[in-house]
Amino acid sequence: SQQTCCGALFQHRGELHHAATLAQQNKVVFEKLKLDSIISTASGCGVQLLESGVGNDNCPVIDINQFLVTAEGWKGVKIASLPQTILVHDPCSLRNVLAGHEYAYQLISLIPDAQVIPLAGNDQCCGAAGTYFIEQSGVANILREGKVSAVMSNESLYLVTSNVGCALYMADGLYEKGVSIEVMHPVTLLARQMGLQL
């Protein structure tokens, strides 16, 4: 068998048996590989892998921002300048559970001339919250409106976030308001400045 979905969305919907089945499949696969760590590219998935017991002390779950920032060899890497303001959204999962939101800032700060600014209201949820934006759309839209307003009060061309659900939900809200801003993962923006296509 192979690596599969982390099961977070099933967990959020209350489908605990399905989420546990996926977690067990991942645990078996990862244990066979004898990994040093599990790198997660989406903070919500990282939390699910951690809390479902897939990651452990011998094989911790590490967010990709942290993994890259703590990697050696950055001095020789050519990164194109980007003299722009880059807003950083802190996903609740990264800030409150994985406790690693500062790594996204450090990663984006590797881009020369970038002005890295936290999105106002980062201590509050954007409203996506797994499946919350589907199940409680009214409240979720109110939460998102605060994020959209914070983006609109800046003249930034870039908003980075480490959670795919947050990215999609905020991008949709910004699109509805006619705001022209790219919403992407911090790694995607850094890769672009390195001349890589993800």
Where are these regions (language model features)?
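Iron-sulfur cluster-binding electron-transfer modules in prokaryotic oxidoreductases
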Residues: 1-198
